[in-house]
Amino acid sequence: VACVGGGSNAAGLYYHYLNDKRVNVIAVEAAGKGIDTGESAATSALGKEGIIHGSKTLLMQTEDGQITEPYSISAGLDYPGVGPMHAHLFRSKRAEFISIPDQEAMDWGLTLSQTEGIIPAIETAHAFAILDERSFDPNEIVLFNCSGRGDKDLDTYIDYFKL
């Protein structure tokens, strides 16, 4: 399980497992204020095929192909597309893409801080928030990519929760 903006951190986690069909690949995107609000960065839900940085991929864009402005409370996830590898994983259904809104991610960031002493980057908090969406079998081994440093997001946490 890893968060996906452009997808570099998730690519590092997934790469060696992609040919192993026993491994479920879960990509967690930022739904921002909600998929239908116009303030989201959920490329799998809102994107279509396009070109960015010379690569054909899934991209949030207007009808005439102009890139639209994504939104996420997490600066690391507000990217208007996903890397070509993730676009392939989405199209081929090799990865499951889930969109998590700001509120759920922030709640999980606070929960991890209070219960585990881990201050996750807000990007990582999005990945952990899927625990509200699904349960895993106790016999499964589940990897969460805990990337980034939450201390860089302390001001955002403090402002958001009015701490």
Range-by-range predicted roles:
Residues 1-2, 7, 60, 71, ...:
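Short, flexible coil/turn micro-motifs enriched in small/turn-prone residues
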Residues 1, 11-18, 25, 158:
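Short, well-ordered alpha-helical packing segments
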Residues 3-14, 35-36, 124-131, 151-154:
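Short glycine/serine/threonine-rich phosphate/pyrophosphate-binding segments
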Residues 22-28, 33, 132-163:
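Catalytic phosphate/nucleotide-handling subdomain of diverse soluble enzymes
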Residues 19-22, 27-118, 159-163:
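Active-site/ligand-binding loops adjacent to catalytic centers
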Residues 1-2, 7, 25, 77, ...:
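Buried hydrophobic positions in well-ordered alpha/beta secondary-structure cores of metabolic enzymes
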Residues 112-145:
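C-terminal structured "cap/appendage" subdomains that terminate the fold
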